Amino acid sequence: MKFKYCAIFFSGFLGLSAILAACGARGKFDQVDDGKIKLAFSLTSKSASNALQAIVKKYNEVKKPGDYHIEITQIAGGYDGGRSDLQTRVNVKDTTNFYNLILNYPDLVSTLGRVGMELLFDKVNTDKLSDRFLDFNKRISAISKPGIYGIPVSLSTEVLSINGPVLHYILKSAKGDSDNVKVSQRTGETTQKSKVTNPLKINTQNDPATKDLWEKIEASAKANGKSNKDGQTKGKKKVEKSSSSSLVNLKQSTDQTTTDDGSQKSDNKIKESWGEYQEVDGGLKNFEFKASIFENWHDLLDFSTRVAKSFTNVKGKDIKKGTDIQGVLGVDSTPNSLFTSVFAAGGGDYNNFFYKIENGRADFSNFKNKGTSYQNLQKVFGDFKGLIDKNGIFVNKGGSYSSNFQKFHQLAYSISSTSGFFYSFAGNSAKRLKFGDNFIEFPRFTQEIKAPSTENGGQSNLLGTFEVKDSSKSKEVKKTNRKEDGAQNQGKKESDKKTIYLYKSQIPSDKTEGENAILIKEQNVINQLEQAAKKDEKGETVTNKVASLETKAANAKKDSSKTIIGYTTTDNVHEDGKNIFKINKLKTEDYDRKIIVGATEEVLEQSSTLQSDEAIVLPAPGKYQSGDAKKVTITQGPNIIGIHANEKENAETQKFVNWFLNNTESWEVKNGKDSSTKQQTAAEFFAESASYILPLKEIFDKDNKKATENKDNNTSNKKQANTYAEKALDLFQQISKGDIVSYSDPSDFRSGKFRDGIGSNFNAAVSSKADFDRFVKGFIATLGSEI
């Protein structure tokens, strides 16, 4: 009652910060001093996780005697899982199992601030960081006093990644000047084919930006369809793993004597899935293509809608299978797209946004009272609506990212995070697992499950086996005396693998759950593994359906124990209850293990996939309309956030964070199979390992020496150049100079609910083709009485 009375008395005169300070205890509690610092981590990125483990190991090695050691507390469920876990521990006042630090978004600071559990980093030197990237601390509600509560150690932004070969086919078809390009025109019940009569125009004469973009688009198509020095198409080297239909197509293409530069071959390949171009009103007839289309939301959505109208394979399918063209534009984060477009439409001013932080409180009145943000949302939604109605947009509804489809030419372009570069493109040998009309890209960190055989016991209880790396085994047997072991044994390599057994009813006494055995409980998985093994006995195993005759002949000579009946992975794939299921993981594993059954492995030609050098990477649209005065770029990524524990642990926590930001150490940096040692801070090591940007002042200086050095290293080393990180760095430099307005969500304990609500309701509107009134009504309903 004391707090309630106090809040009422002061609310008319003071901001929330003053109220909280004046009212004393607000649920704050001390954690038990257990002599260690716990860092909560919920990111799903393996590279980020591995980097953080290396950092913790390093700190515990170099810390002074008496300093607290640090350990990682793993939380499942990504950022949302971390948010939920922290809220629960705050609510129950967890004094024994709470943590001191968490990597997450700054709305968690507001959640902590409501009960006085936020930790001010007043003993951490943040002088190395650019001030503009610390400004978000001024937009956090419920904190008791101004200061640094969140430190951005892993920044990313969003880019517009164009599938060059696909856009080339679209534009070249609409231009009508490629070889044998014809257009479908529907007249009554018949479809007639004719030359393009109202061609699209590309002004390369008077528009340097458009000229440059078109040249890049042409180059990407040439790369996609070009021939190797020996005259083979670039997918030919992998043909022995391609499907029989691909073999036929490849033979036809190589039998033809062509002298084109590769772009025509690329167009022909894209046409197989995208279909014929159609001249329609409101499409690309007489349309002028400009590079500036991709700079603002209004023009981008208008152009995308025109493309969707021009291809039946896009507009004509309300329900799309996984193997269909998914749309023209892919959007990985619909909240990001809606927030940045509305923010840009409001002149890059938080006073015109959905909500703002003022006097320590979040003010949602602009949206609630149907002010500028509500009106701008209505305009933005209206631009999206045309694309939605023509089935031209793909949205991520929970783990199915645009890149999963764009890399297989199923989207023309997409907007996604710069942290996802290494997931965004196909490799030289692109593989995927097909389940009927759907598929997933062949996951990383995946093992094949082999059918049981007499060699591994032949028990009816045994479903199959797979192998994992055994770190306890030596990779090479040491050389021994010739007289004792013979020359033939010297330097002989020993397998560094161990076999894991999958059982269906019980694990035998000579095996141990989580060490060399896993018990499968899901009956659907058991049935599909057993069916696959039975098919193998008849020579009908599904995993070889797409193999060439050469591969099948080789497989026929193999023992049945080599037959693949499924797959298991620790990669971040989502279980669907049909083909992908969660199973128990091994004791040595940090990530959930999944099992994949009923799948057909398919290896694709490179011309059927998007390589990194065939993509054109642009900033995500920075304006709502071309005439807007300010350009906006989103800044996002997890921050280091401190949590109050007790006086000693608070001091030790700040000591670690200060070391993390400022102390230079030696780090092993892997580059493919090679590795080298690099001198840098833990923060720099973490950001580089996870494809993030650390906002250091020195990389934003006018002379930009460090940025140039980083870019040179990126393009000259053996790894593929990270064009997403390069674009992010360029945008962040412009933010630092004040040339671009940075957007990040104002941080309030209700921010997550607002973000999730607008995203889920927009995604539902994409599926149902709802109008604005229905969309916004559903959105407001999800917010409840809290907002």
UniProtKB/Swiss-Prot annotation:
Query: Where is this protein localized, as stated in its record?
Result: Cell membrane
Q: Provide a GO CC annotation, any one.
A: plasma membrane
InterPro entries referenced in this protein's UniProt entry, alphabetically: Lipoprotein_10_C, Mycoplasma_lipoprotein_cen_dom, P68-like
Position of the signal peptide:
1-22
Q: Where is the composition biased (Low complexity)?
A: 242-261
Keywords, ordered alphabetically: Cell membrane, Lipoprotein, Membrane, Palmitate, Signal
Q: Where is the lipid attached (N-palmitoyl cysteine)?
A: 23
Topology in the membrane? Lipid-anchor
Q: Where is the composition biased (Polar residues)?
A: 181-208
Main localization category: membrane
Spans annotated as Disordered: 178-270, 473-495
List residues with covalent lipid attachment of type S-diacylglycerol cysteine. 23
In Pfam terms, one family for this protein is Lipoprotein_10
| Superkingdom of the organism of origin | Bacteria
Per the record, where are the segments of Basic and acidic residues compositional bias?
209-219
The family line of this record is: Belongs to the MG185/MG260 family.
Q: What is this protein called?
A: Uncharacterized lipoprotein MPN_288
Q: What is the lineage of its organism?
A: Bacteria, Bacillati, Mycoplasmatota, Mycoplasmoidales, Mycoplasmoidaceae
